[in-house]
Amino acid sequence: SYSMEHFRWGKPMGRKRRPIKVYPNSFEDESVENMGPEL
């Protein structure tokens, strides 16, 4: 799960990491489980 998310959002979010605030309703749940340890 983590490796897949990291590969998908690792590139676009690695630099921006801002879109998470644009639509937290959709990423909040995934961000906490998948990107939780990264953030």
From Swiss-Prot:
Transmembrane segments: none
Keywords: Amidation, Cleavage on pair of basic residues, Hormone, Secreted
Keyword Iron: no
Gene Ontology biological-process entries: neuropeptide signaling pathway
Molecular function as annotated in GO: neuropeptide hormone activity
Modified residues (Methionine amide): M13
Subcellular location: Secreted
Gene Ontology cellular component terms for the protein in this record: extracellular region
One of the Pfam families matching this protein, by short name: ACTH_domain
PANTHER family attached to this UniProt entry: PRO-OPIOMELANOCORTIN (PTHR11416:SF7)
Function noted in UniProt: Precursor protein for pituitary hormones that regulate stress and environmental adaptation.
Family: Belongs to the POMC family.
Name this protein carries in UniProt: Pro-opiomelanocortin
Species for this entry: Squalus acanthias (Spiny dogfish)
Lineage of the organism: Eukaryota, Metazoa, Chordata, Craniata, Vertebrata
Gene (UniProt): pomc
